[in-house]
């Protein structure tokens, strides 16, 4: 933890030296580290550099890597704008110390192992036991003890320094120097894992440079990829990386490093073609050829060497004859060692249908060699012949080229190649011997297949002397497998047969089978083979003819030479003048080109100087602006500090307030100190207002939300259950399959156990049967005697049981006859009892059509028992004027509460359209005699039956489609909140014809149902059963069918027949019970049936 006081850098350095002298290096390191991290003095001085050097020495001595990293990053921020050279000095000194300590640790480890104790005394038991248990040598154990910590420290130092200096153009040279030292460290100590991490780290740094290349305000000192110096440094570092990977034999990392080098060269070439030197390309192709050779890719190895030879050939000044011969020989040997079909996909790729992957890999490798297309052996040979590689190669390579490419001698080619290969002595050429032997063997085998249909195995061994029997047989099989030749080994005849056959691997599956004259090589018979043989025969015959006519041809040649001499003498002067003119013209062209080139160079140098001057001026301007900006920020920071201090004082004074105490408890003291007091009050006020509004809104919505909460939970539960169901359905097949597999395994195991048990019991059974037979034979006489006795006893038992069975059947028949007689007598007595009871019932007074009287607790009339006590009659409702109920004023709601949708949707009861009378065809639908009855309807059945000659007050609408109607349809005050709608009744007609009575039809027109009631239960929301056929859908549910009659003239109800006069007192109790203060129990919406159930009684 940093101290609460500050020391000057000079005092801190002096204090650290004093602590070091007394042996307190850790305290000295803390003192110097606190000084580096202090924010008081951010201006660099030479004392800071001395402090950093001492700090690095202490970090190395104490192995404090994290403190060194922190101090270096702090020092970078201090010296970035002022003195970057000081940072480089500190970093170099730090790495030098770490490397020196690592070397000392290595020497110390070796010396400790070399120290030998008493020669007369052998190894102590502890040392022997340690060697056996660890399984490592003494040097390895000592390296892990002494050297490993310093290796880890040095690796962390390299990595931290690279992270410190990345993407900084001012220290780019030091960055690449440290990178190369890191590669040397990995190579010297064979740190393969660290080498891979280092390569990944450098790739990540390059990606970051490319990412932030054009990003604004990221880093003013970032590396620019347009700089040739930066690109050259990166390219050289990648070449060192590739060389290190090859030396460490990390071929996978070598291939990745080759890709990195190729990417850097492409990037440099895009920026400036002159950036990449030819020597860099030569080194790159040389390393890449080695990587391809180690990977076993002979084709791209030869292509890389050919590219290297082309670069060498362009460098005419530094390319001597010896170097040209050496490079050409190597290129030609590498090309000749390419096996057949190396550019084609393997059989495995064709069988797995991944040929596109092979093509993509070939294209990628071709890009690494800067080739437009994938190379082939034929293409490489043609390119080598074009640039004169065979002519420039050595004699050995020339002889091999002639033998393998332009020679048809199947019986001698392998021996001739072997004799040439024996002359190769150079180590870099000996690596191609094995490949050349394989190519020569395949070549000989192909040429032999042209001449012979079958050849003995002994002769094949003499023709191809490179291999023993097993290797030669493998060669023949591989050649046939890869469609190079069509051959089969006949071990019975001890020979090799050539040609297509179903028994060969190549027979019947190759695309070349349909081609005429398949041979696998253009030197074999076929169309192309015949042409080549004819050409060779013509050449040899022409040579023979020239030898026979040599004298004649000599005279013709001499005459031709004399003609050339005569022509030369005649045109000599003209040709000499033409040659001189051409030479002078070339010299003038060269002088003009050099002059233009010098002028362009001077112009470029002038422009470069101007750009550098402009850059320096821009840099100075930027530094001035940066200094001004720093000064402005410093003053602004001071002002902000003063304001914060004033604010803290104010907050400290107001902390005793209750509001502030609550805020402190809620947000914490630290956050409270950074807040504005007025802002705190404003936030507190807004929060209280928001809480109050939220509480009010919650109270208002609580009533709505409460009813839908359970429904929402059910909906969510349905979704969850559906998801679980789908999951179980998806899992069911797999579980079933697992269960079936386990069951089958169990059944198989059980079956095996049963089979095993059955075999055991079968053996026991056979032994038992044998034993039984033996016993039978031994006791035959005794057995026969016992059998005869048993038969006698059996006959006696059979006779006794037959007698018992006959007696039992006789008793059963007697009992059955007695039971039938008793049942017939009981049936007769029951019939007599029923007849007697029928006579008694007929003599009783009939009850009529009325049913049994309903119990008091189930009847509203029975509950109101005033009429039983001879109490004065009460009116069920106050008398009202005879007017349509829709003409009255709307009734005000009796309480204020939010109305629901069911309360406001009254279109089905308060409709403005008057109700029509149904058609006469459905006249029975409006009777109340055929519907379901209540239990007490039999009491007033004769009194309340409607007459058929009654007519409704809307008979003028009989010509239109009818619908049922009740008084509730015309009453506007039956429901609270209903909208007042006035209906104007049409004029009544006197002589309106009455409808003819028709029998009701089962398939007549449907009853009218208002839209608001469709798909809903009747009663406006209450769960009630639908009305029966013939019942009015708008009738109150507390009245039985047939109870209500149509209104008479004037809008009043007509009194039913056999009733007392309308104006007189009535002793009939109300069927709906006395009126209560609460809503009617039979209403659809708590008061829907009041008007309809009471007006008719007036």
Curated annotation (Swiss-Prot):
Keywords: Coiled coil, Cytoplasm, Initiation factor, Protein biosynthesis, RNA-binding. PROSITE patterns: PCI. The keyword Protein biosynthesis applies. Residues 574-844 form a coiled coil. GO terms for biological process: egg-laying behavior; embryo development ending in birth or egg hatching; formation of cytoplasmic translation initiation complex; translation reinitiation. Component of the eukaryotic translation initiation factor 3 (eIF-3) complex. The keyword Zinc does not apply. Signal peptide: none annotated. It comes from Caenorhabditis briggsae. It is found in: Cytoplasm. Residues 905-914 have a biased composition (Polar residues). Residues 608-648, 805-857, 877-895, 916-978, 1054-1079 have a biased composition (Basic and acidic residues). RNA-binding component of the eukaryotic translation initiation factor 3 (eIF-3) complex, which is involved in protein synthesis of a specialized repertoire of mRNAs and, together with other initiation factors, stimulates binding of mRNA and methionyl-tRNAi to the 40S ribosome. The eIF-3 complex specifically targets and initiates translation of a subset of mRNAs involved in cell proliferation. InterPro entries: EIF3A, eIF3a_PCI_TPR-like, PCI_dom. This is Eukaryotic translation initiation factor 3 subunit A. Belongs to the eIF-3 subunit A family. Residues 324-503 form the PCI domain. Residues 599-648, 805-1098 are annotated as: Disordered. GO terms for molecular function: mRNA binding; translation initiation factor activity. Residues 1080-1098 have a biased composition (Low complexity). Transmembrane segments: none annotated. GO terms for cellular component: eukaryotic 43S preinitiation complex; eukaryotic 48S preinitiation complex; eukaryotic translation initiation factor 3 complex, eIF3e; eukaryotic translation initiation factor 3 complex, eIF3m; multi-eIF complex.
